[in-house]
Every structure is written in C-alpha cells, then in structure tokens.
Amino acid sequence: MMKIIRAKLHGIRVTNADLNYHGSITLDPEQCEMAGIYPMEFVDIWNKNSAARISTYVIFGEPGSRCCVLNGAAARTCQKGDELIIAASADISGPEKLYDIKPRILTFLPDNHVDQVLYYDVFQSEKRPYDFRIVDADKHTIESCHTWPNVDITKLRSDLAAKGWSEAEIDSFIASHFSL
C-alpha cells in the first residue's frame, strides 16, 4: 500500500483555539466539501509558523464561517493567525493508481477566503512514467497557479496610490504581476 495526499487546505489561518473542548479541529463544512474532507476524518496538520505537526479528526463548524479552530490538546500547538496545511490522505494499491487520483487543494487568503482551487495531476510524460503538475481547477491550466497568499492586495493598492500612482497604473501593475 502507498499513502498519498487526497485533499489539502493550504495556508488556512487559525481563527481560534479551545483547550477545553474534546479534541479535533473545527472547520467550515463548505470549505471541507470543496476540498473533499469529511467529518470525523483524520487529517495531518502542519503549522507553518511553529513547525508543529499533529494528527487529529475533523468536525464541522458553522457553514460560511471560514473557521479553523484547534481543540483539546491540539490547541497547544498553535496561535490565532498561524498558517496551517491540513492534509487528508488515502491508501492506494500501487503507483499506477496515481493516474486516476486528482487531489483537490484549496489555497487561502489571510482572511480564510478561498483563493484558488487546484488539483494535483500525475501523468506520463516523455521524460518519466510518473510526472507531476499542479493545475488550476477552474481554468485547467498550470500557468494560473500562484504562490503569493500573504500579499495584501488592498494594502498594496493603498501604498501605490500613496506614492501617486493612478488607478489605471495600479490596475495595470496588479494585472501584470498577479493572476487573480
């Protein structure tokens, strides 16, 4: 058996920690549904701020809340605002099954709004039998993927305006450097 990634919430921020709750991680069910993460499913959690790595199970919070609450002992591994990677896994019988699986990956803005919906794609290329790419699920292109979740576009716009840039110049700059 081979353990693989099945779904991932990448860059979601901790909104709260509740030491006295029974345990688990509380997540927005709408976001979990988008990624394919289920209630009571065990997930691995990696804290990008502290490097803590834990495993716990998912419970659902309020739909649309964008919550990410570590409960019980897991609450000791994070601070409000920490950026997490939450990964659900699956077991497959062998590498040939990799061609059939398209793990969904959600990336997040600092306020826990979903930024992008991506999927991982294993394919056979001219160079190797198991090649890899990240694909934008909406556009079905690899070019659209970006890795700038910590950029505050509103603040960037404000800073450029304070330097005397016109709205047209700001729009052109944003369009040239960020694929929204």
Curated annotation (Swiss-Prot):
Its main location: cytoplasm. Pathway: Cofactor biosynthesis; (R)-pantothenate biosynthesis; beta-alanine from L-aspartate: step 1/1. CDD domains: Asp_decarbox (cd06919). Its EC number is 4.1.1.11. Keywords: Autocatalytic cleavage, Cytoplasm, Decarboxylase, Lyase, Pantothenate biosynthesis, Pyruvate, Schiff base, Zymogen. The modification Pyruvic acid (Ser) is found at S24. The active site is at S24, Y57. The keyword Cytoplasm applies. Its cofactor is pyruvate. It catalyses: L-aspartate + H(+) = beta-alanine + CO2. Disulfide bonds: none annotated. Substrate binds at T56, G72, A73, A74. Binds 1 pyruvoyl group covalently per subunit. GO terms for molecular function: aspartate 1-decarboxylase activity. It is an enzyme of class 4 (lyase). InterPro entries: Asp_de-COase-like_dom_sf (IPR009010), Asp_decarbox (IPR003190). GO terms for biological process: alanine biosynthetic process; pantothenate biosynthetic process. Is synthesized initially as an inactive proenzyme, which is activated by self-cleavage at a specific serine bond to produce a beta-subunit with a hydroxyl group at its C-terminus and an alpha-subunit with a pyruvoyl group at its N-terminus. It comes from the Bacteria. It is found in: Cytoplasm. PANTHER family: ASPARTATE 1-DECARBOXYLASE. Heterooctamer of four alpha and four beta subunits. Belongs to the PanD family. Catalyzes the pyruvoyl-dependent decarboxylation of aspartate to produce beta-alanine. This is Aspartate 1-decarboxylase. It comes from Paramagnetospirillum magneticum (strain ATCC 700264 / AMB-1).
